[in-house]
Amino acid sequence: MEVIRSQKRTPSNDTVSNPKIPLYLTAPPMEVRLEEFELFAVDRLRVLKGVSDGLARGRNPKEMDDLVDTLWKEHMRDPDASVMLNKDIISHFVLRLVYCRSDELKKWFLSMETALFRHRFRLQNFEAQRAIVGEFGLPYKAVTGAELEGLKERLGQVVRSLGQISPTVEAVYYKVPFEEVPDLVASRRVLIQKGYAFVAGSQLVSLVVTQFRSHISKALILTNRKWTTTIQEREKDRLTPIVEALSTSYLGPDYSQSTEYAEISLMDIDQVAKSSFPLCMRHLFEKVREDHHLKHGGRMQLGLFLKGVGLKLDDALAFWRAEFTKKVGSERFDKEYAYSIRHNYGKEGKRTDYTPYACQKIILSAPGAGDHHGCPYRHFSEDNLRAALGRMGLSSRGMEGVMDQVRNKHYQLACTMTFEAVYGTSCDAGINHPNQYFEESQKILKSKTPPAPV
Amino acid sequence: MTREEIESRGDETMMDAAQIKNQKPEEFFNVNYLRIYYGNLFPYSDIHKWLSYGHDGKHPGCDEYYFGRREFSFTLENDVYLRYKSFKNASSMEDAIKSNFPYKIDIGAVYSVDPDKRHAYSQTGTNVFTPVERELVFDIDITDYDDVRYCCSGADVCSKCWPLITVAIKVIHTSLTEDFGFKHILWVFSGRRGVHCWVCDPKARRMTNEQRSAVAEYFRVYKGNENNARKVALMGYSLHPFLARSYVDYLKGFFEGELQATQSIFSTKDKYEKILAMISDEDIQSELRGKWENSARSSLSEEAISLVRWEQLKNTLQSKKHKAPTLRMCVEEIVFTFTYPRIDLEVSKQMNHLLKAPFCVHPKTGRVCVPIDPNNCDEFDPLAVPTLSQLIEEINSGGSRMDVDDDEDSDTSLLAKSIKFFRSSFLEPLLKSCKEEIESSYKTKIGKSKDSFSW
């Protein structure tokens, strides 16, 4: 696969016989534009992160099938089937580069790609599935004719033993060495005879997923070797920075432009903080009110959040001034703090309009002594976190679920569960950004306010 | 060894003969006997041939270091335990055993490198010390059946409960050959209260831990502990063909015949309450209880009573089984609870698990761990297995001639029969097949290198 600068793309000549799911066995000989390199990868990453979220929430297989279908259609679809296929293949190989670089990354990528493959496979019809099995070059023969007749009775017994009252012996069975389907053997879901398991078409997933997983696992090791020995150095000015950024990227909206839901004024701010701020921002806000001061990290995290929430520059200046001057005096405020607030709004210096921090960035920050920024789910002690959650109104039962997620280091899921407990509603998308929390919360609260009497 | 040679060995042997005459009947085992056993009777070269799997150095395709990569462990007197022992060849193994007199010898896996040199290799990366081959093994111990045998408990075993092991051998052996297609299977008496099974096909030796675990789970039916009364739960509308075959060919007949005769599982209130607890319907339980409490004054034998009650139970369940899904196969569940094999899953799941070697002597009983013929396992009697003292006595009275190879018919020594069986029905077919495999993979390798021109 060759990555090129923006040029007309040469039509790809890959004669992939049309299976709907490519197997990523070899990197295809096509040219890829540099922009596509990153864009395709980002789209696929959205799908994989969606899969990850679904699994962490314990979705059952059918729900995962639907989730994968939705995610794929949303991010990877293209009206032109061959373009869609190319995007599929290219994005996978780019992400291999991204995720081969450490054991932890490899493990995540392998799990998600395998799950993605499993559910995409399940969504295919039987003919397509058979074609894919064939693509793997698995030497499994379909059992037919007299051999199948001789086995029919016992195959029916297997089906009945699994809880189906009238045995529908499927049309096709595959004769597979029993070693290749250990999970089907262990649960006695297949007939075994003379070392061969008779796997029904509908059970093919197990077989195929094992092969897929094993292949990707080996490929990642090879890719890693190539990366560390040649590619990383060779591409240090071109692809390497993109690859390194992709594994930590946040993929949601950036909230730099506030929306209709999110205009707040100074008068409302205390009330809104209590009702709609996520825990991290509530804490910072309370500390500002309490201490009339915040250190730099906290000023950045809260300040940008407030901008995203719709606080205008003038109101922001008034807010910070009102608090800080209780401690440091008006002149010092103008000299030392006002400038950086204006800077955040893009009115000073290089005039970049800074974007509010996403959860990922906040979680990775390192608050020190005297700091109050960061993610409470990560950075607070258990006792402090429980106290804070109590003040938000969580019951002790709700708190347990949240603490469980915290123990498993799923900080964003913990925040999502808090959201769900506070508003009594489910948040399927999951919280990825404090401003998202705020917007969702406002949506719910506004929909609950009774219409004004006429 | 000839009689002359035995007598010329000097005082040592004669002193032992005197000792034997004065021995207490319980003294089946002691270190001196063990020394003589290791000196004269332990079949070193047979064990070596087995575990070499044809790599005897005679064929260019042989791996001469194969035997040396096998782990052995010795348990010495006073429970001193030596792991990661390995031997270059049969004679170094023999020397080590004769100088250590281990009370127990365990066989482990074949590793990627000589276990002796394992510290030179890291645990990660490409040059690792890791198991590469190991027989698929099973361990069946009668103590796992304590909740369903009434004649003995703990370490004891008798002619009434040993048949449970016999049935287990039949069920597992049939499955290993019919379902899994294995051909080279060795069953060995564990010396006191159970059996071990060694599956030695090349395919079996190369199985991963995951695959071993899958086979062990395939065999697993009993999921019991003190907390549940219904320890076998057969769901679905029929039995899986493997379970159905085991039930029809072995378990049902055994339960309704021999088991009732030896264990009389319905004859007293304690016993039948246990069975009633397996029926998940209180009404049926009360109905049967009512019938049985009142017939206590019957003049029938215990066995006859049990059979009558079993018939009553079956009839009642047959008419009522549609009442709930958990009653559908309640009759089968009861039969399985009492008769289906109970293997120790942990032994089978990991390649590096050590298992006692055949032809060891059990320190508590003095009995030799002899092979069992799975096709004739009804004939096997654990209480008739030669003990160490019997063997020593036989040597001293000049009755054994250890040239087992010559004069097959006239050799009646106690151990010779077992060794002959080991050779003819297990070792010889195994080695023949190993040699064929080495030959053919060598030919393939040669063929491949002829075709390539890599410089």
Language-model segments: what does each one mean?
Chain B
Residues 1-21, 290, 400-404, 450-455:
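Charge-rich, low-complexity intrinsically disordered and helical linker regions
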